[in-house]
Structures are given as structure tokens and as C-alpha cells.
Amino acid sequence: MKRRLFPLTFSAKMMGFIALLIIAMFVLLGVFLNEQYARTLEEQMGERALSVAQAVALIPELREAFSAERPDEIIQPIAESIRVETGAEFIVVGNTDLIRYAHPLPERIGQRMVGGDNERALVHGESYVSKAVGSLGPSIRGKVPVFDDNGKIIGIVSVGFLMEDIQQVIGERLIAMWQIVVVIMILGLMGTWLVANTVKKATLGLEPEEIGQQFQQKEAILQSIHEGVIAVNKEGKVTLFNQAAMKYVDPELDKEDVLGRHVTDLVKHTRLPEVLQVGKGQYDQELRIGDKQAVVNRVPIYYDHEIVGAVATFRDRNEIKKLSEELTNVKNYADALRAQTHEFSNKLNTISGFLQLGKIDEAVDFIQKERKIQQEWIHFFIERVNDPTVSAVLLGKISQAQELGIDVDIDPSSQLLTPLQERQQELLVTMIGNLLENAFDALLASGIENKKIYISFTDMGDDFIFEVEDNGPGIPPQLMESIFEEGFSTKEGTHRGFGLALVKKAVHELGGAIFLEEGELGGACFVLTIPKHEAKEG
């Protein structure tokens, strides 16, 4: 394609187009106003001519003059005085034979009226306005019949204004109108220039082709980002998003379904409206979007020190959280194995002591007793708990409790036979582990001799229900509202106050609830309820 030597800029093109548009618009408007004004003026002049003619036809002296020997001597002075007073071009009065009794040119009195538009007045007795070419030229005239006292038509009055004079008036008015139009056109062109410069500044001096290229580049970058991105205007309506964001919101939504919608229609609990109001960014905040947990960053967008929108980026929290939970579970397993190893070592030492003392029977009794206890626990979990991971965690925690000198009792009617979803299993292991760790810490810090923990669980009904109770000092009433806050702890030391906060987050993610009560053992009693079908947001 051949390039122009001097290519026109977008501003120049726009200015030229708008200028042509303004000129064409005002030219058409001028022509329309010209026609409208000419038509209106002609109608006004016609009505004026008709009203003068009607007034003349009703003058008694004029009507009586038709029966005089020389009507023109009476009628001509009357008609002329009225013509001069009203500014009419002519007032012609004639009889039924169209012989003139009055005319602005006296030499034409006695001659026949011309124009061919008198029949309606003389024959039908009508009053009307007509256009015709008379002896003085083209004119607009009002025609009125003259009646005698008996209602008989005895003549006609014709009052007119020459078209030439009307066109002159129209021309004078049009000159003034076109002067105004020209001034408005000049102002319009100046406005066009201002608009063109404003657009140029708003587009940072970029041409449409450059804007298009940058838009495509931005779109490619936006879609290649692994993080979800959603931008809104100051009203909170979506102006930009990428496909990664739609994976969180709804992969089936089209672009047309998203753009222009309020962000809260797509993400229920988003805090972007808050960012728009406050004007401060929010970083690394957790938010549930659909069935996914995300880590969100939100920042306002400023233009000329004014908030014009906001943008949110978010990434999947599940991978990070899953890794964290796996590490937590590994720690629980490690603690359980360490406890079992330590407990097994203690039992071996006990057996060794019996054997060294020669008390074979006591050693055998001890082994059988321990074997029975282990078999009872294993048999219980095989019969009453369907999920091996949950069973393993509970067994490990029981061993850890025994090592710490804590007696663990599980309600014999407890059961967990309903299969767990993968996410439910992962979070349930975290919740059980943290609740039991919390109970261990509370009992060890209390100094109580007979430390006890009571556990019960059931899957009867629509929910999974878990209860963990201890005989420790419990939670003071004034701290019950704060116990689940991240970083809050009743125990001294750093890196505390996260266990119960994690439990609460996990419970809420599964659509459940956690309650803190005073247990029958006198200590704290935590009750979890989790829907069997994992809740989805919205």
C-alpha cells in the first residue's frame, strides 16, 4: 500500500469531519429557516391583506357609493387613504362586471380587473387569499365581496402586497439570519478545534492505529498472566478482566455477560467498592470466589489525583494452602510417630524391667494388656470410622496424649461412616489436629493432675458433628469473642494464636460452624458442624 506524503493525523481528520458536518448542518438549517420564514411571512401578509379588504368592504359610504352616478369619485379617495395608512401596495374596488372604481394608478380606474381570481368572491360570496399576477405584477391579495343592505353582491374589494416587496423583506431578514449562522459556524469550528486537542491530550498524542496496537499488546499481556485480573470504573462496573479471572468467577460467562456488570454481581464478597470509597490498597487478603479460595490484592486507580476505578488481582490459595496443610499433617504424623516411638520405648523398658526381675508372668500380662488396648482402638476405628486418614490422625493424637499423661476418651457411639470429599478430609484433619493440640496445651498449662479429653463425632443427619472437650480451666467469657482471631492466644510465647483461627477458616470454607461451650468436664468444649455436601458460595 502506498503511503501518503503528508498523512493526516486523527485530530486533523476529526476536525475536518466535524467542520464539514457543522457546515452542512447549518446550511441545511439555513435553507429550512429560509423556506419557513418565507412561507410564514407570505401567510401573514395574506391574512393582513384579507383583514384590510374585509374592513374596506364593510365601510357604509363605500357600499352606498355603488348606487351613485360616479362611484369612483367616492370610492377612490376612501381606498387610497386606507392604502396609505395600512401600507398595502394596492386597494382595488370593482363592481360585479370587474370594472375598477378604485386603483392606486388613477388612469386605470374604469378598466377591467385582471388576475382571474375574482370568481369565488363575486359568484360564491367567499372571502379568501390568493396569489396572482395583476396589473402591477405578482402579488398576494385578499379578496372580499361587497354586499348591499339586502345581502346582494354588488362588488369586490382586492387588497394586495407585491411579491417583490415581500421577497425584499425576506432577503433583509435572511441576511441577518445568515450572519448569525456564520457566527455560530465559526464558534462551532473553534469548539471542534478544542475537542480535537482535548482528544489528542486524552489519547496521549497517539493515533488510532497506535492505540489499537497497544490495546492488542495489553490484551495479550493480560490474557497471558496466570493471576486473575478484574478492573472496575468508579461506579464499580467491570471494565476489564482476563480469562484467568473467569476461571474463578464462571468459565461459561462470555465477555458481553461480564463487561458493564457490577462487580458484586460476579464476586459476592469483593471489597473493591470499599477500595473505591477509601482510596487505599488492600494486599494479600483472602477471599472465597465461587468454589475457590483466593489471595487478593486490590488497588485504586488514580487519574489527575481523582479515583477513577480500581483493579483486583487474585491467585489460587488452594495450592499454597494445600502445601501448608500437608506440612501440618506431616507434622501431626511425625508427632504421632514420635509419641508412639517414645511410648513404645517406655513399654519396652517396662517389659525389660519385668524380665530382669524374673517376673515373666507380669511381663506377659503387661504385653497382653497393651495389645488388647491397641486392638480395641484399632477395632473401634475400623468399625466406626470409614476414612483411614482421620483414623490415623486420631490414633496418633491418642498416643501423643498418653505420652503427655492425658487420658483420651472417645464416645463409643461415635461414628464417621459417610465417605468424605477430598477437601473435607484435608480440612477435617487440620481441624481435629489443631483442636486436640489446643486441648493439650490448655491441660499442660493448667497443672491439673488427672488430665482428660473427651471426643465424640457422628455423621447421622445432614451434618458431620465433632466435639472436643477437656477438663482444663476453660475459656473466660470475656475472651470467647476473641479466641478465634488470628494471632490471639491465652498462652505466652511467639508463633501462637493461629490454630483456632485456622480451624474457623476451615469450618467456614466447608460451610459449617464452630461453637465454644462450657463442657461437662468443666473445661472448654468445641463443637464443629460441617454440611455433608460442601457448601458453595452464593
Swiss-Prot record:
Question: Does the record bear Transcription regulation in its keywords?
Answer: no
Residues recorded as bearing Phosphohistidine in the entry: 342
GO function term, MF aspect, one:
phosphorelay sensor kinase activity
UniProt keyword Nucleotide-binding present: yes
Q: Where in the cell is it found?
A: Cell membrane
CC per GO annotation? plasma membrane
A biological process (GO) of this protein is: regulation of DNA-templated transcription
Could you tell me the membrane topology recorded for this protein? Multi-pass membrane protein
Q: Which UniProt keywords apply?
A: ATP-binding, Cell membrane, Kinase, Membrane, Nucleotide-binding, Phosphoprotein, Transferase, Transmembrane, Transmembrane helix, Two-component regulatory system
Q: What is this protein called?
A: Sensor protein CitS
Its source organism is Halalkalibacterium halodurans (strain ATCC BAA-125 / DSM 18197 / FERM 7344 / JCM 9153 / C-125)
